[in-house]
Amino acid sequence: MTESQETPITEDGEARPHRRIKSFVMRAGRMTEGQQRGLEQGGPLFILPLADSPVDYDQVFGRSAPRTLEIGFGMGHSLLEMAAAAPELDFIGVEVHRPGVGALLNGVLTQGLKNLRVYDCDAIEVLNRCVADNSLDRLMLFFPDPWHKARHHKRRIVQPEFAELVRRKLKVGGVFHMATDWEPYAEHMLEVMKVAPGYRNQAADGAYVPRPEERPITKFERRGERLGHGVWDLKFEKVD
């Protein structure tokens, strides 16, 4: 995700603040009863407000535990599965699409999970305003919008500025884990991360890692595998 490179000027000659190019488009969607239940009953319990200063997540969760943040969890199936499988870890999910937030929260309520919280706003704002530097053990970005057309590549969230923002938020030893089913985007991710300072690629061959066991396989991924489509996982560890 990048900022515009040109500073707009107002009619009176004053510089207008940059308007950041966003990596997502808000889409309207109909809610199921379960999604609506998740928002109405789970929202007050599990949706966190956008803060103006770093949040004390130990206080939010009532404990100190390794912390994972996922950007763009979609309908929440993978995040829900990971949180249920690892109650000793704390998870924060960020998603702007309300049906997905509702679906995740409905699952949280149904399973009685205590180790998951949600932001329903722009992930860049969450990282900049709510997450303290050197505080995350893992940041996950699974199947972000690849923005296929060349003129839209500037909207891809994985850009040098984003890699640096993630690095600041990770602890030393923390991992930035990305996955995509679009090979040109995987190549773009690798190009960005290979030259991003302060990271080490965990892949033995300096490219992609085998699918980690902790990342659940989605139904779309299974369908893609049947059709012969690939999935590329990248893991970069913060070393500085």
Curated annotation (Swiss-Prot):
S-adenosyl-L-methionine binds at residues 70, 95, 122, 145. Its EC number is 2.1.1.33. It comes from the Bacteria. GO terms for cellular component: tRNA methyltransferase complex. Disulfide bonds: none annotated. It catalyses: guanosine(46) in tRNA + S-adenosyl-L-methionine = N(7)-methylguanosine(46) in tRNA + S-adenosyl-L-homocysteine. Substrate binds at residues 149, 181, 218-221. The active site is at 145. Keywords: Methyltransferase, S-adenosyl-L-methionine, Transferase, tRNA processing. Pathway: tRNA modification; N(7)-methylguanine-tRNA biosynthesis. This is tRNA (guanine-N(7)-)-methyltransferase. Belongs to the class I-like SAM-binding methyltransferase superfamily. TrmB family. GO terms for molecular function: tRNA (guanine(46)-N7)-methyltransferase activity. Signal peptide: none annotated. HAMAP family: tRNA_methyltr_TrmB. Catalyzes the formation of N(7)-methylguanine at position 46 (m7G46) in tRNA. NCBIfam families: tRNA (guanosine(46)-N7)-methyltransferase TrmB.
